């Protein structure tokens, strides 16, 4: 099926391009998400008329994604899962579960935007997850899968302590640089 892209999609192409995709992908994902439309003569003419508007809308989405990306910088999520003695969790962690946790923390991100990088999270530990906020904005976040609330609390405290010490080091470095600049 030939479609016209209404926004940049990393795996398909850029805004306004006519691409061929499987009908189910278009019908079940691209059309409902308003990321594409059927490639007809009428739609091609309509697209040319609306190209500036769509590009402006895409720029707004990009800017919003950059703002959200800055708030997600150095973000980590702690998930508590039941696990066996050797660290294998019962079930697995899914993108839906991660999206639900992000929503609870105030970030409305679709599970379609999350990428586990081809791995399945079936053990306790630390994992890197990428969030595609826009085709040009991909933000990595860290997921920690722990066994208990106590482990989660200890991990949270350790992360906060690390962030405080890094911030203090950065402030000290900045003050040293300022002092060195004053001496020059």
Swiss-Prot record:
Swiss-Prot/TrEMBL GO biological process terms: translation
GO CC annotations, alphabetized: ribonucleoprotein complex; ribosome
Gene3D superfamilies in the cross-refs: Ribosomal protein L9, C-terminal domain (3.10.430.100), Ribosomal protein L9, N-terminal domain (3.40.5.10)
Residue numbers spanned by region Disordered: 156-184
UniProt keyword list: Ribonucleoprotein, Ribosomal protein, RNA-binding, rRNA-binding
Annotated Pfam families: Ribosomal_L9_C, Ribosomal_L9_N
Basic and acidic residues bias locations: 173-184
Summary of the function given for this chain in its UniProt record: Binds to the 23S rRNA.
Official protein name in the record: Large ribosomal subunit protein bL9
Organism annotation: Wolbachia pipientis subsp. Culex pipiens (strain wPip)
